[in-house]
Amino acid sequence: MASPQENSTTLDLIRQHLLDDNVFLEHYCSETETTTLIYSQSSSSSESLDQSFSFEPTLNYATTAQSSNLEVSTFFNNSKTEFDSFEFGTIPNVSAARSSSLKQTSFKERKPSLNIAIPVKQEVVQKVELAPTEKKHYRGVRQRPWGKFAAEIRDPNRKGTRVWLGTFDTAIEAAKAYDRAAYKLRGSKAIVNFPLEVANFKQEFNNEIRPLVNSSRKRVRETVNEEQLVINKEMKIEEERVPTAPLTPSSWSAIWDSGDGKGIFEVPPLSPFGAYSQLVMI
């Protein structure tokens, strides 16, 4: 026998199911107006898990009027064929289906993605204009139209005439050339472009003077030697000359013996005076 608590719980479940299902009540109330309704349900799903599990709740309703009490067994046998086909329907998961359909529709109705190309960053090249450097003017230096630099200096020994020193690639080189020339001409009184480099100019000037002095000494020696050679040559030439015979009486004998005596009178006149140039023989 089942306990009264279990019976009450089963009755509550059956009552809730019957009250919710209006179609089931309309079908069975017409046949059992004055009879006692006994409902029994067996779950097919519970039979697969637990074969022996089944419940047969009974509900006896007393009718007041015309019908008599019917036995439970006769009612169950009559309605067994109808109850066998009855099964609880499973409620489909509407939320999952809706979500999947919404996903599909939203994916289909979704607008195609736009391919937006990122523009390439353009590097702006800024032209930096350098400020023109101040051109320093050097003493004795002039710039030619084609870019070269010319160096000139005035020679005080020649009444200030310009002396050409040459052309240079840079103004500094031309200025140094002017400083060298100014130091050579004026010495320590010269006004130069680079005063700190005067000591270098002194050394260069001294190195240039030494070979000049040596060369001058060599030239003096060479001239002395040449003069001595000339004197010696003249002396040798005089010695090599044949001495002439003097006009003495001893030398006259040879002349008389050799000829008719006319050779002596063919001697040119020795007097510087023209009046006595000719000798008259008497």
Swiss-Prot record:
Induction: Induced by ethylene. Residues 137-195 bind DNA. Expressed in roots, mostly in root tip and lateral root tips. SMART domains: AP2. It is found in: Nucleus. One of its GO terms (biological process) is defense response. Keywords: Activator, DNA-binding, Ethylene signaling pathway, Nucleus, Plant defense, Transcription, Transcription regulation. Its main location: nucleus. It comes from the Eukaryota. GO terms for cellular component: nucleus. One of its GO terms (molecular function) is DNA-binding transcription factor activity. The AP2/ERF domain binds specifically to the 5'-GCCGCC-3' motif. The affinity of this binding is higher if the seventh amino-acid of this domain is basic. Transcription factor that binds to the GCC-box pathogenesis-related promoter element. Involved in the regulation of gene expression by stress factors and by components of stress signal transduction pathways. Probably acts as a transcriptional activator. Belongs to the ethylene-response factor family. Class 3 subfamily. This is Ethylene-responsive transcription factor 5. It comes from Nicotiana sylvestris. The lineage of its organism: Eukaryota, Viridiplantae, Streptophyta, Embryophyta, Tracheophyta. The gene is ERF5.
